[in-house]
Amino acid sequence: MTTVIQRRSTSNVWEQFCEWVTSTDNRLYIGWFGVLMIPTLLTATTCFIIAFIGAPPVDIDGIREPVSGSLLYGNNIISGAVVPSSAAIGLHFYPIWEAASLDEWLYNGGPYQLIVLHFLIGVFCYMGREWELSYRLGMRPWIAVAYSAPVAAATAVFLIYPIGQGSFSDGMPLGISGTFNFMLVFQAEHNILMHPFHQLGVAGVFGGALFSAMHGSLVTSSLIRETSEEESQNLGYKFGQEEETYNIVAAHGYFGRLIFQYASFNNSRSLHFFLAAWPVIGIWFTALGISIMAFNLNGFNFNQSIVDSNGRVVGTWADVLNRANLGMEVMHERNAHNFPLDLAAVEVAPAVRG
């Protein structure tokens, strides 16, 4: 008879839990950031789905005129949204237990705060989890750094902007048409299109899309032939193979002749760093711009029209933008005030006749 003697495990439940959380052998890495990320994102997602489907109207402007955003109250997928918290709540922290009843909490838009704050904690932890997994695997930390761009953008529109404006009611609604409404109102009140940081963000996003398409098409066009005409070219690559799957010299030569020599990268590492850095830096600047405009340091304005020697207005594109901004501002919160602030606070300026 054979007797097998095993050493009894001396680790307790907590040590086993710690080992499981930080193990890179799991199908999905949990990590310490994941311990907080998972419940917060599940909470935000669950509340969003319920609110998008059935939340009652919210008194967003604090003037007893509720706005419906859910599907069961007459909206569709395009027009539906989770409406931001009421202006009557302002920046006050408004959990369920701060309201006198659940009906009051829903009427004042409590679900918006619950969703946004849990969502932000969740995406912060997701970024930390990216860094944590990179650290465990001995990788460099740039994946988390790149992800910081959309995290900064989300933080700017959901947290920094409401803080600067003094109320969560100014945050971005959680829906398709609500997002576009937020963009139009932001342009009307802050002239974001004329802010240099937003312009850098546009260059980052559009430039990143252009560079991604250029890189992908160049690589695909210079693949090393490994298959016949009857086979898919994708079969010519084996996961983990040591040799390069495309000819970077050919791609470099093509692009160098198409534009000029120094427009083409001859170093694969610097090329991919550039592809990552360009859109990330652009989105960083946009998030910074929104955070600046949150405190009303707005984009360039040209409110003083150009006039000739007889006092007649010489129409410019700036006048067109100004009138468009005023029109959008008049439509915004039309029952909360009679005039946009810049119409009510200054003397009537000459307008372009069109």
From Swiss-Prot:
Chlorophyll a PD1 binds at H198. Tyr-161 forms a radical intermediate that is referred to as redox-active TyrZ, YZ or Y-Z. C-terminally processed by CtpA; processing is essential to allow assembly of the oxygen-evolving complex and thus photosynthetic growth. The chain crosses the membrane at residues 29-46, 118-133, 142-156, 197-218, 274-288. It catalyses: 2 a plastoquinone + 4 hnu + 2 H2O = 2 a plastoquinol + O2. It is a multi-pass membrane protein. PROSITE patterns: REACTION_CENTER. The record marks H190 as: Stabilizes free radical intermediate. SUPFAM superfamilies: Bacterial photosystem II reaction centre, L and M subunits (SSF81483). It is an enzyme of class 1 (oxidoreductase). [CaMn4O5] cluster binds at D170, E189, H332, E333, D342, A344. Fe cation binds at H215, H272. Pheophytin a binds at Y126. The keyword Repeat does not apply. Keywords: Calcium, Chlorophyll, Chromophore, Electron transport, Herbicide resistance, Iron, Magnesium, Manganese, Membrane, Metal-binding, Oxidoreductase, Photosynthesis, Photosystem II, Thylakoid, Transmembrane, Transmembrane helix, Transport. Cyanobacteria usually contain more than 2 copies of the psbA gene. PSII is composed of 1 copy each of membrane proteins PsbA, PsbB, PsbC, PsbD, PsbE, PsbF, PsbH, PsbI, PsbJ, PsbK, PsbL, PsbM, PsbT, PsbX, PsbY, PsbZ, Psb30/Ycf12, peripheral proteins PsbO, CyanoQ (PsbQ), PsbU, PsbV and a large number of cofactors. It forms dimeric complexes. Belongs to the reaction center PufL/M/PsbA/D family. Photosystem II (PSII) is a light-driven water:plastoquinone oxidoreductase that uses light energy to abstract electrons from H(2)O, generating O(2) and a proton gradient subsequently used for ATP formation. It consists of a core antenna complex that captures photons, and an electron transfer chain that converts photonic excitation into a charge separation. The D1/D2 (PsbA/PsbD) reaction center heterodimer binds P680, the primary electron donor of PSII as well as several subsequent electron acceptors. This is Photosystem II protein D1 2. It comes from Synechococcus sp. (strain JA-2-3B'a(2-13)) (Cyanobacteria bacterium Yellowstone B-Prime).
